[in-house]
């Protein structure tokens, strides 16, 4: 098959920064290519129009058209034209796009369009308990209604999305994936005792403002505990504060703060090094669809304490391959971290079970086959 992915982001030096959507598309593209399918990646919002081929994947960098009042519509029509040329010249079979801001709301190419839920703006605003922009919800709803087929990375995201948009349609559930070969624990490096790692954007919805209160409880019990924070610092929508990190700092107890290191954004490879050497990884998030960061840490056989909200049980089995605790239950969350810091055997057990779960459910081979089988059904 010949498949195109339309995306606002992709983890490539030429494409700018990327989050979970880009990472999941990158992994799926590699899996499909390895299985013999031809993949095109169309990245809009770029600084220039460029086409290049790398590792058997054809990339289209697409520059948005900017004319006041018509930018979105004209950019959509430009994308539609590119897709139709791929159909004409390369026999493209279908195009897949994320639900985020409904980019395909006015894109009607001469092939099936698949929408994969990684979490729309409407979805995240709902989880964040804040209002969604009217136009964003309008375009997201229209894109979902117009799609020929719908996928979701988790049951939870599918059910919440159906309620929010009053959709009477079924979703095929296919999770995000990772390349297990790229995420394995390097035992030769060893790990640093008593290190607690959080990697991801510093932002309210990821539980960043709960982390200081959780770590204060850990530090009371274990004065050797160290919290390492990795990721870009985001502004806070509710308070209009330009820095979540600035908001976090006063929440730490004075002594505990001395054991906190914020390293900002680091390279993908460097993140893997920090995962490898950490004792425990923590993810006290309030809003996700299906977090790639959890899967990456589990693949590297790390003991995890994560949020118990919604999607969580589709990734982690509580007490089997990690602990699940509500982010605002600070004392209990801290107790689980302390338990793992003090119990090497339990950390090892969780790590073994975690990687086993990832291999069975979230490897690029498994997810690429599920996706390809789904695409074939659409094309029949």
Locate each region found by the language model:
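Short hydrophobic beta-strand element within catalytic cores of glycosyltransferases
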Residues: 303-306, 316
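Nucleotide-activated donor-binding/catalytic signature segment of Leloir-type glycosyltransferases, i.e.
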Residues: 241-266
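Aromatic "clamp/platform" in nucleotide-sugar-dependent glycosyltransferases that forms part
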Residues: 286
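Conserved donor-binding/catalytic core segment of Leloir-type glycosyltransferases
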Residues: 189-206, 212-215, 227-230
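Nucleotide-sugar donor phosphate/pyrophosphate-binding loop at the beta->alpha transition
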Residues: 77-78, 111, 123-142, 180-184
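Conserved acidic donor-binding segment of nucleotide-sugar-dependent glycosyltransferases
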Residues: 318-319, 323-330, 339-345
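Short alpha-helical donor nucleotide-sugar binding micro-motif in glycosyltransferases
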Residues: 265-266, 273-278
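Carbohydrate-associated surface elements
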Residues: 156, 177
């Amino acid at each position: 098959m010949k498949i195109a992915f339309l995306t606002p982001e992709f983890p490539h030096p030429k494409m700018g920064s990327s989050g979970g959507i880009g990472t999941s598309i990158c992994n799926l593209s590699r899996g499909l290519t390895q299985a013999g399918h031809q993949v095109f990646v169309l990245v809009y919002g770029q600084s220039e129009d460029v086409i290049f081929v790398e590792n058997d994947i054809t990339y289209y960098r697409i520059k948005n058209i900017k004319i006041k009042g018509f930018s979105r519509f004209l950019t959509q029509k430009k994308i539609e034209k590119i897709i139709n040329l791929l159909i004409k010249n390369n026999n493209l079979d279908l195009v897949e796009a994320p639900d985020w801001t409904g980019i395909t709301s006015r894109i009607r190419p001469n092939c099936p369009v698949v929408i994969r839920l990684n979490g729309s703006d409407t979805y995240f605003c709902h989880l964040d308990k804040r209002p969604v922009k009217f136009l964003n919800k309008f375009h997201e709803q229209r894109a979902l209604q117009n799609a020929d087929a719908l996928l979701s990375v988790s049951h939870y995201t599918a059910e919440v999305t159906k309620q929010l948009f009053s959709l009477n349609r079924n979703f095929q559930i296919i999770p995000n994936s990772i390349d297990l070969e790229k995420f394995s624990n390097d035992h030769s490096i060893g790990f640093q005792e008593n290190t607690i790692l959080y990697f991801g954007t510093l932002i309210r919805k990821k539980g960043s403002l709960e982390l200081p209160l959780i770590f204060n409880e850990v530090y009371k019990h274990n004065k050797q505990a160290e919290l390492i924070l990795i990721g870009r610092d985001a502004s806070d929508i509710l308070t209009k504060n330009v820095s979540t990190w600035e908001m976090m700092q006063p929440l730490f107890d004075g002594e505990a703060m001395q054991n906190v290191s914020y390293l900002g954004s680091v390279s993908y490879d460097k993140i893997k090094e920090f995962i490898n050497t950490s004792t425990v990884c923590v993810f006290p998030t309030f809003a996700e669809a299906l977090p790639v960061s959890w899967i990456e840490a589990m693949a590297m056989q790390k003991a995890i304490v994560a949020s118990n909200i919604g999607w969580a049980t589709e990734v982690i089995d509580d007490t089997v391959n990690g602990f699940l605790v509500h982010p605002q239950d600070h004392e209990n969350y801290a107790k689980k971290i302390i338990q793992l810091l003090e119990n090497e055997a339990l950390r090892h057990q969780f790590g073994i079970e975690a990687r086993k779960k990832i291999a069975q459910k979230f490897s690029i081979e498994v997810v690429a086959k599920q996706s390809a089988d789904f695409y074939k059904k659409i094309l029949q």
